[in-house]
Amino acid sequence: MVILVLNCGSSSIKYQVIDMEDASSKLLAKGIVERIGLPEGDLIHKPVGKQPFELHRPIPDHTTGIKLVLDALTDPEHGVIRSLDEVKAVGHRVAHGGEFFPESCIVTEEVKSKIRSLFEIAPLHNPANLEGVLSIEKVLPGTPQVTVFDTSFHQTIPAVNFMYALPHAYYDKYRVRKYGFHGTSHKYVAQTGAKLAGLDFENSKIITCHIGNGASVTAVLNGKSFDTSMGFSPVDGLVMGTRCGNVDPSAVTFIGEKEGMSYAELNEMMNKKSGVLGLTDLSSDMRDIDLAYDEGNPRAILARDMHYGRIRKFVGEYAAEMGGVDMIVFTGGVGENSCEMRESVCTGLEFMGVEFDREANKGARGVNKILSTPGSRVKVAVIATDEELVIATDTYNLVK
């Protein structure tokens, strides 16, 4: 069954085409549409076994972008399917499912209405995610669609971990609480890591660290999300590329009063101007920070130490919450590729039973590999995340 997986952002569409069977999957093509709504847009199409294809032209909206993707998929030279009839379903990544969606679901009018109702608390992502669904209805009418939510995995978090100590009325009226994100990735790498280490996923204590430009840590207790570092929004928790992570709210309101900033300006500051970018005034990319760190830049040293240290703090917190830990898993763009980050986070965790294998860690990039010694009581691993495969699998299981 050929499944198209879409991740629609405000000005981009990431996609994969995967041929799914009961026990196997085969990637046929992947690519990205960028700069939607700007004077010059881009399509970069990468079919497996064929030469990549690029197209540069105005792409005014998501529907136009998806049409270009479908044209590329059926192109005689660059395509991977003969006709669009071969696309049996479309799976969508949706950032926020609120309390409505504890699992993936087939798209209905009610589902679309609930996604729309969450625009207020997910203004950066849900509108674009829904736009992808509506565009498919126009260009592939009648094709089953499935929504897979970043928040679903975290719907098992107990109230003691998801509630804020604010007046309860704000939860009752507005559902202000911790939701967590990156759930699709956390679930996949926890399951895959447990299998790699020979652990029983449903009878284990696993801490997953999804570290990229956005980053979060999750406690997975007996196969279910028990706590996670992101909160009501993805700005909470770790020090990230441009997001501040944990901060005293009074510090933010104080800055707002002093600078005469609106709520929208404060929100933009915390989301887009903070994190390692704000600390260094250099870059939001950890590769740039690493170079500046090696050159002795004091701000880069501070930013990297804060970034790594915050991850280590959450690992310790979640080990305490779960009464121990069996495995720590690293994933995400930085988690999969930064040997320095993994070593730094694990250094000092020997008291918890972590015996980190520095030799195994060297050069481990974009692979699935155990990074702890054979005798380590707590296993450590790096797992390459595959959110698209999870979306394709959920889509296949719902429509087959």
What are these regions (language model features)?
Residues 1-98:
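N-terminal glycine/serine-rich phosphate-binding loop of ATP-dependent small-molecule kinases
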Residues 9, 92-96, 211, 325, ...:
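Glycine-rich beta-strand-to-loop/alpha-helix junction loops that act as flexible
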Residues 72-88, 193-200, 315-326:
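Phosphate/pyrophosphate-binding loops at sites that engage ATP/ADP/AMP, CoA/4′-phosphopantetheine
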Residues 73, 77-125, 146, 153-161:
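Short beta-strand-loop/turn "lid" adjacent to the catalytic site in phosphate-handling enzymes
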Residues 153-258:
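Glycine-rich phosphate-binding loop of actin/hexokinase-like ATP-binding domains
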Residues 221, 226-262, 268, 332-363:
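Catalytic phosphate/nucleotide-handling subdomain of diverse soluble enzymes
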Residues 259-303:
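A mobile "lid/hinge" subdomain adjacent to the ATP/sugar-phosphate binding pocket shared
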Residues 301, 305-329, 335-400:
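Internal helix-turn-beta structural module
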